[in-house]
Amino acid sequence: MASHPVFIDLSLDEQVQELRKFFKKLGAEISSEKSNKGVEDDLHKIIGVCEVCFKDGEPAQIDGILNSIVSIMITIPLDRGENIVLAYCEKMTKAPNQPLAKVCLQSLWRLFNNLDTASPLRYHVYYHLVQVAKQCDQVLEVFTGVDQLKSQFANCPPSSEQMQKLYRLLHDVTKDTNLELSSKVMIELLGTYTADNACVAREDAMKCIVTALADPNTFLLDPLLSLKPVRFLEGDLIHDLLSIFVSDKLPSYVQFYEDHKEFVNSQGLNHDQNMKKMRLLTFMQLAESYPEMSFDTLTKELQINDDEVEPFVIEVLKTKLVRARLDQANRKVHISSTMHRTFGAPQWEQLRDLLQAWKENLSSVREGLTNVSSAQLDLARTQKLIH
């Protein structure tokens, strides 16, 4: 989101005086006279009544008023500005409609970007602007990913507790519109826990698992099992379900659903979507072992009809998780490569062997080129002596 620098031509005293008069004229319970306690008290009074401009004002006019308030706020020293900033942030979350919420979002973004990057107040402003962004469907304008988020606070990292609170909020505001991003946020959240406090993260761990399972674009689920809060769920149904999605095939999920249908539904998971995902994961697992699969094998393993095989394979190829070729004439699928569902010691060993083979092949090529080069030099010398 673009942000413009804050600057007002009037002096602080003149700005305060004008703001007091403006809100007094709108009917707010505020004196038009400056406080003898200083500009900070003036700001407290002004912020306390600033929502009255939401009633009848035009968005452009309101934006100008809020801009003036922000221009005064950023002059307050850090040690005396926390309560003022927090009070202002709370007011900005009270916008009565979407157009005004956008104005409030712009104001908070302006405040965020004009605070010193080392100011701990930036965290509080950002938390509230995410709340406001949700109100006006602008979340992706202020949050595009975890890396971007961390860079925002590079000069003043929030505490683990603050980041946990922020990650939970970001999960809530993205889960209905961007499951992939929401899933990444939850994984980051679980990563903030240590062995000492992972046991208290049960609810967060369950949300993380459910979000990852529900995300149609998340297929590599194995890393979740290594997260400490997830380990504490071992023996619970949600952990059993995750384990099925990590390494089991479709029949295991079907059996689990038959035994625990109420549990799956209570987690907000869609059975049809689960079946679709498990079919794809099962296909990937089969592709790891079989470079060639018949249509009959796929109808049996994936529990689909014969006429559904080709459309299914085409959908799999669109994900780019598997490279394959359909052979309609012989009713077969030829596999070129596939992403592994799990990546453990066997896969690392396989990768090591592959790289070692490449290294040996490159050495052979280099040796061959050296021999060719030497032969050409010898030939050139011989021809030179003859002439």
From Swiss-Prot:
Q: Where in the cell is it found?
A: Cytoplasm; Golgi apparatus
Q: Which domain of life is it from?
A: Eukaryota
- Disulfide-bond pairs as recorded: none
**What biological process terms from GO does the record include?**
formation of cytoplasmic translation initiation complex
Any one Gene Ontology MF annotation carried by this entry is:
translation initiation factor activity
Q: Which SUPFAM superfamilies match?
A: ARM repeat (SSF48371), Winged helix' DNA-binding domain (SSF46785)
Q: Where is the PCI domain?
A: 181-340
Entry keyword annotation includes Transcription: no
Concerning PROSITE patterns, the annotation shows: PCI (PS50250)
A GO cellular component annotated for this chain's UniProt record is: eukaryotic 48S preinitiation complex
Q: How does it assemble?
A: Component of the eukaryotic translation initiation factor 3 (eIF-3) complex. The eIF-3 complex interacts with pix.
Q: Report the protein's function.
A: Component of the eukaryotic translation initiation factor 3 (eIF-3) complex, which is involved in protein synthesis of a specialized repertoire of mRNAs and, together with other initiation factors, stimulates binding of mRNA and methionyl-tRNAi to the 40S ribosome. The eIF-3 complex specifically targets and initiates translation of a subset of mRNAs involved in cell proliferation.
What family does this chain come from, according to its entry?
Belongs to the eIF-3 subunit M family.
Q: What is this protein called?
A: Eukaryotic translation initiation factor 3 subunit M
Source organism of this protein record: Drosophila grimshawi
